[in-house]
Amino acid sequence: MDRRTFLQAVGSTSAVAVAGCAGQSESEPPESVGEWADDGSIEFGLPPFQDAEQLNEQYAPVFEWLADGFDGVDTVKGVQTTSYSATVESVVNGHTEMANLSPIISVLAAEDGVNPLVINWSHGADSYYSYIATHAESDIDALGDIAGSTVAMVDPLSSSGGLFPRYMLTQAGLDAGTVNSQPDDFDIQWAGGHDASLAALQNGHVDAAAYGDFQHPTDDDSIVKVAESDPIPFDPLVAKPNTPDAIQQALIERLLNTPESALEAHRIDRFGEVEEGTYDPVRGVAEEMGVEIETLDPESESDDDSTTNSTSETNESTTNASTSTNESDT
């Protein structure tokens, strides 16, 4: 199955509830962001790293800022997918004009022409970490102790909640499986989100959990960190393939000038430019783990209904949308 066939296969099982497939013809490329938007609406794909209400609140001020910046754009709508692969499918096939992609997905999708626009900066950095944690009273003191345990993870295509934890466990000498198979040395319970992965640990359903450092509790001494990854570049905001350079640049400039009030509600410091080589660390780990988008079988990605390959539209984030909630990382 080649890359394009895989993406079409995901689409055939997706039931993508998104308008906006028509787009512009190749002979008449759009000359403005308003023309590029579908009927005045930019649809923005979001992976399920938090619940829909939180995502809607978090992205609303950024969506408002984008919508207000371009003639012909009436709304920017958040479309939350229920799996990471469905997020990339939606933007690669033009069902959504923009998306927030996990670092690993952005690396894979670049070969399909998905264009990174900006990268998130938070706490003065453009990178974050993957944590593997356990209960304070657990016998798990090091990664090697996870053998024989059950570990909650986010999604096979989550960087901090899937790829990097599996890589760390591999480096510790354990078989960590593939994106399509369970490991030999421990079991993975795919939770579908960073909050759900932590909750599985807190509720005693698993022995350990992997998630982004932003999810780690600061007021719960019963949860302790076992290991953390090397720095992972934050997720980028991207535009669909064949977006003209002038439109990409207009979107970049608008995002780089996002006002402080919107950034505070979005829980980041700022958006920054994507430099050459930014995602090389992610690409390197993906290569070592043998992860390619065409190797991902959408039927075996997860046994959890929360990560089936479909999308559902969040409450529309328009120019009068509300704000607040957690920072987002994948």
Model-derived regions, located:
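Hydrophobic alpha-helical segments
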Residues: 1-330
